[in-house]
Amino acid sequence: MNFVSAQLPDNEERRAEAVERTGLIDSNQASLFNIYCELAKDITGYEAVLFQLFDSKERCYLAEIQPENNETQNLNTRRPKEGSVCAHVLLDTKPLIAFDVTKHEITKTHSNEKGVKSYIGFPIIDKNNYALGMVCMMTFSKIKELSQDKIDLVEKLIKKAAHQIDVMSDQKQLTSDRLINALDIFNQETNINDMIVFKNFIHVCNKMDVSKDFEKILIENNLCTIDSKSKLELTYKGKKIQDSMGLHTKIMNNI
């Protein structure tokens, strides 16, 4: 019997959009999820752990621990969804548990070129019930069964990872909304429809240096002035616009 690839989830288009909204694939934030791989490995004693998100085309490892390298790595490894056991994990809210991969209905027909002995996969489900990806654990040297307590513990761990993704996605959306609102206010108050000028104005708000060319533009528009120490600072008009935009320093640092 040949291995049967997983069908796409019924909500695949919306699910993939939810993954894209996280902005985590190919980002510099993947290392934030190393701890989940390390804890899962410590709890289970399994030799490999993969923290994966599935976009519309393939699966991407945000973090991974491989047997040949005992440290967590962030290589943004990409693999096909088609033909993978991991894709089956997206189809259920419960973990796929195959302590002996030669006996489980899904895994027993897989080609298993890497010689996996035991496999467990936990879906990463966001607050909107989209399966963004999964965390899987594997052994290669021997079959290793786990107690229900350990399964439950890992499941709670993965739920915490999903919650972290939710929080990060919400913050990302909130920052985007605030920036759009700030840009609208800046355009209305200054009649300057130039994103680069806006960015340099934010730099001044954040006590950062700008080029002489943009100093001149900001001064000409009565947004900035030169203080007694020859430093560029906001005028009264500039400060009013900054207050109207309501951007905090942490958000301005992201621009």
Mark where each language-model region is:
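Signal-transmission linkers at sensory-effector interfaces
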Residues: 1-31
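Juxtadomain coupling helices with adjacent low-complexity linkers
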Residues: 2-4, 133, 138-188
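Helix-loop-beta substructure at the N-terminus of cytosolic sensory domains
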Residues: 26-61, 207-234
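Short hydrophobic/aromatic beta-strand element in the GNAT-like acyltransferase core
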Residues: 48, 121, 134
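Regulatory sensory and allosteric helical modules in signal-transduction proteins
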Residues: 50, 54-60, 70-109, 117, ...
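A short, aliphatic-rich beta-strand micro-motif
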Residues: 117-126
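Signal-transducing coiled-coil/dimerization helices and immediately adjacent hinge/linker segments
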Residues: 169-244, 254-255
